[in-house]
Every structure is written in structure tokens, then in C-alpha cells.
């Protein structure tokens, strides 16, 4: 068995075309979604990621802006800028690129975003809504993972899904989405005993810990579906996933590559949530 490659680039391309069509429809009502991104400091990876989001938004017809603040910017100034965006009726969605400099509290900043413009889905209100099955804005990587599984027609009902990692950004929210799809979900983490035994029982594995080579063919059962969220740069700057891709693809039924798997869907879901935010505030959701 050689695994079906779950091509995130192609899935994202098709999804973004549908978003572009919806943006065009919205423009007929006189509304254009706008994504505002706050970037504090000069972290190279963050700058690159923010530019990718801006470019992707503009490519589907949205307006996008980057508010680039100096590394030494105080927390008060960041919060003031957020308040301005919260009250700007032209802004549909707001996200703050992390990590933030040490003088700025990430939690304070995330809590200061208007939950109705929180397109990253990290505000406590939006996290809470996810956990009572009444979500509006869901964190983008978990949402992207579910789109990959849906696109591949993978039926999750009754399946054993194992999530490696318990972060609030990926592990915990994707576990909740898998539960909503009626999978039986196990979360593995750094204190889990006998991780291999859990992995061997898994029909679906989602790994999101940033440990290259963690998942090997020895701990994957034949026919499992593998979603690799890891993206750790090696000494040459090449991105490595958590999964030993070349060997695991020989026994899995489907697998995401790194890069080109989950990553393109994460940015796509930022756009999805920005469009949703604009529709909701204009009363245009069906």
C-alpha cells in the first residue's frame, strides 16, 4: 500500500476559489472584507507569514493591511491600536501575529480583540463556544485539518483518532472538532505512558508537537490516515514534519506532506474566518 497524498496546496487552491466567488458576491451588496494584522517587532518568520496572509487575502479580493509596530512598542500602545481596529467599521477581521515581545502580554492582547473580529479563534469567548458546540470562529489550523479530512472523504464516525499535542492552538481544538465528527479521541502528550500502544490503535493520527521523526512506521497501523502539523526547520532551513514521511507513506492509507500539507489550509482558514466575520456583522449569513 502506498498512501494517497493529501495535497494541501491543491485543496487550498480550490477552497480559495470558492472564497473568492463569495467575496465577489459580497461586493455586490457594497461590502468588502478587510483583514488587519498587527505585527510587533522584526521576527523574520513572523514577517514572512504576515506577508503571506496579506497576499492571500488580496488575491481573493479582500482588503488587507499590516500594522507593523516596533519591537520596543509598549503593551499599552498595542492595546490602543487594537481598540482602534475593534471600533473601525471597515475592519472585518483582526489578528495579532505571535510571538510578541516580552513586554507585551499575549493573553491580554488576545482577550482585547473583539470576539466578533477574532479570526484566529483564540479569544476565550470563541474557545468557550467551541467547547459547547456553538462555535463561530475556530482556530485556523484545526479548521484546515478538518477540511483536508472532508476533502479526502474520510469518514471519522466511530474511528479511533489520536492527537499528539495538547496546545490551545492545535491539539485541544482539533480534538474537539474530531469529537464533533463522532470520532473516539485520545490526546497524547509529554507525560503519556506507552505512546506507541495508543498510536498502534489509531485509525487517524494528528501530530502537532514539532518533533521530527516522532511518528514512524513501527507505531502506525496499516491503513491509518496521517495528518502531520509539524514544521520544524532543520540545519539547512528545510521544514521537517513530526512524521517519518518516506517510511510511513508506505503503510498509511493517506498522509499530508510537509511542507504543502496543513500549512496552506491554515492561511486559507484565516480568509474563511474573515469572510465569515464580514457576513455575520452585515447580517448576510444564510
UniProtKB/Swiss-Prot annotation:
- Could you tell me what this protein is called? Bifunctional protein FolD
Q: Which GO terms describe its biological process?
A: L-histidine biosynthetic process; methionine biosynthetic process; purine nucleotide biosynthetic process; tetrahydrofolate interconversion
- Going by the entry's taxonomy, the superkingdom of the source organism is recorded as Bacteria
Q: Which UniProt keywords apply?
A: Amino-acid biosynthesis, Histidine biosynthesis, Hydrolase, Methionine biosynthesis, Multifunctional enzyme, NADP, One-carbon metabolism, Oxidoreductase, Purine biosynthesis
Q: How does it assemble?
A: Homodimer.
| Presence of keyword Cytoplasm | no
Q: Which organism is it from?
A: Staphylococcus epidermidis (strain ATCC 12228 / FDA PCI 1200)
Gene transcribed to yield this protein:
folD
Q: Which family does it belong to?
A: Belongs to the tetrahydrofolate dehydrogenase/cyclohydrolase family.
GO MF: methenyltetrahydrofolate cyclohydrolase activity; methylenetetrahydrofolate dehydrogenase (NADP+) activity
Tell me the Gene3D superfamilies matching this sequence. Leucine Dehydrogenase, chain A, domain 1, NAD(P)-binding Rossmann-like Domain
Q: What does this protein do?
A: Catalyzes the oxidation of 5,10-methylenetetrahydrofolate to 5,10-methenyltetrahydrofolate and then the hydrolysis of 5,10-methenyltetrahydrofolate to 10-formyltetrahydrofolate.
Amino acid at each position: 500500500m502506498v498512501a494517497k497524498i493529501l495535497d494541501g496546496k491543491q485543496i487550498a487552491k480550490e477552497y480559495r476559489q470558492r472564497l473568492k466567488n463569495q467575496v465577489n458576491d459580497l461586493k455586490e451588496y457594497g461590502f468588502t472584507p478587510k483583514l488587519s494584522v498587527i505585527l510587533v517587532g522584526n521576527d523574520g518568520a513572523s514577517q514572512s507569514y504576515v506577508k503571506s496572509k496579506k497576499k492571500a487575502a488580496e488575491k481573493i479580493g479582500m482588503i488587507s493591511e499590516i500594522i507593523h509596530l516596533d519591537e520596543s512598542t509598549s503593551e499599552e500602545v498595542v492595546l490602543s491600536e487594537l481598540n482602534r481596529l475593534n471600533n473601525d467599521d471597515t475592519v472585518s477581521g483582526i489578528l495579532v501575529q505571535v510571538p510578541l515581545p516580552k513586554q507585551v502580554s499575549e493573553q491580554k492582547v488576545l482577550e482585547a480583540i473583539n470576539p466578533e473580529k477574532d479570526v484566529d479563534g483564540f479569544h476565550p469567548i470563541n474557545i468557550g463556544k467551541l467547547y459547547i458546540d456553538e462555535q463561530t470562529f475556530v482556530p485556523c489550523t484545526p479548521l484546515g485539518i478538518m477540511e483536508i479530512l472532508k476533502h479526502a472523504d474520510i469518514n471519522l464516525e466511530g474511528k479511533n483518532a489520536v492527537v499528539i499535542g495538547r496546545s490551545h492552538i492545535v491539539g485541544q481544538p482539533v480534538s474537539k472538532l474530531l469529537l464533533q465528527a463522532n470520532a473516539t479521541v485520545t490526546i497524547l502528550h509529554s507525560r503519556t505512558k506507552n505512546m506507541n500502544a495508543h498510536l498502534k490503535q489509531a485509525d487517524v493520527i494528528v501530530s502537532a508537537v514539532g518533533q521530527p521523526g516522532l511518528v514512524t512506521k513501527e507505531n502506525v497501523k496499516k491503513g491509518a490516515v496521517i495528518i502531520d502539523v509539524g514544521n520544524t526547520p532543520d540545519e539547512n532551513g528545510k521544514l521537517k514534519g513530526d512524521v517519518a514521511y518516506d517510511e510511513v507513506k508506505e503503510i498509511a492509507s493517506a498522509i499530508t506532506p510537509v511542507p504543502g500539507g496543513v500549512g496552506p489550509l491554515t492561511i486559507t482558514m484565516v480568509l474563511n474566518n474573515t469572510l465569515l466575520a464580514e457576513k455575520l456583522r452585515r447580517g448576510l449569513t444564510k
